[in-house]
Amino acid sequence: MIIFSGGTGTPKLLDGLRHIVPEDELTVVVNTAEDVWVSGNLITPDIDTILYLLSGRIDRDKWWGVKDDTFQTHREMKELGHDESMMIGDLDRVTHIMRSDLLRQGLSLSESIHELLSVYGIGVNVLPMSDDSVRTIVETPSGHVHFQDFWVKQHGVPEVLSVEQEGIEEASICSLVLEALESDDEVLIGPSNPITSIGPIISLPGMSRILRKKKVVAVSPIIGNEAVSGPAGKFMTARGFDVSSRGIADCYREFLDVLVLDDRDTTSPEQFQKMGVDVVSTNTLMKSLEISKDLSKKIVSIFANI
């Protein structure tokens, strides 16, 4: 099974899925359009969240970063007048330094991730969507900013006028992702932001054409008219999509077979049938590992019946 993932929502699902599906049968394709260089090192937030989850190091209170991390280096730099744009933990920074050193040695992003998977003893295949640079740029009333500036510096407060992925047309799907897609027919789109997390992955040239030939199941990150977490609603509105599970189906309608809704969602199934999308309702609000496991079992069953 191939899982398309961002840094929120999908990691919680993956936490349960790896207990249901053997790790060596899972490939996680991760968004890299939110990556940014900070203090001389490449930060890959979504990839790092997956790495920390699978290595048992994630801070489960925040669902990002390393548990029990400290921030002495960040504080010391601030005291010395270096305005580091992101608050980076000391243990988290180790990963960034190791990856950036590998990149400076000439390794690709996917090759650097392979090295980190080995170091952390991770059996799941984790891949970047592309080895090329793609940047999510958010337009607000005060101008265009990188996604991290919008989300970290501006706390996601400004109105979003538009969202674009800079460099997406020139980027190529990672060759290892293409290999995985050639050998696996099941693609699970996790409950991550459809515009800034999943959007870059499916917007890579040629990806939609490939997905039309696959069994594609998506888990909605929207319950009712609200995102479970993060700024998905703002970005969907900026792109002209309804902030609803129907809007999620609309984002993926070109290739989507089944959309998994939360059982609290009251959207009429007929609205999806008109789009050629089947729906399955279950508990998608993963407040515990057991709920994540139950959802994962349901997803495995859905794929078996497509």
Swiss-Prot record:
Its EC number is 2.7.8.28. Keywords: Magnesium, Transferase. It catalyses: (2S)-lactyl-2-diphospho-5'-guanosine + 7,8-didemethyl-8-hydroxy-5-deazariboflavin = oxidized coenzyme F420-0 + GMP + H(+). It is an enzyme of class 2 (transferase). GO terms for molecular function: LPPG:FO 2-phospho-L-lactate transferase activity; magnesium ion binding. InterPro entries: CofD (IPR002882), CofD-like_dom_sf (IPR038136), FbiA/CofD (IPR010115). Homodimer. Pfam families: CofD. Catalyzes the transfer of the 2-phospholactate moiety from (2S)-lactyl-2-diphospho-5'-guanosine to 7,8-didemethyl-8-hydroxy-5-deazariboflavin (FO) with the formation of oxidized coenzyme F420-0 and GMP. Its cofactor is Mg(2+). 7,8-didemethyl-8-hydroxy-5-deazariboflavin binds at D48. Belongs to the CofD family. This is 2-phospho-L-lactate transferase. Pathway: Cofactor biosynthesis; coenzyme F420 biosynthesis. GO terms for biological process: F420-0 metabolic process. NCBIfam families: F420_cofD (TIGR01819). SUPFAM superfamilies: CofD-like.
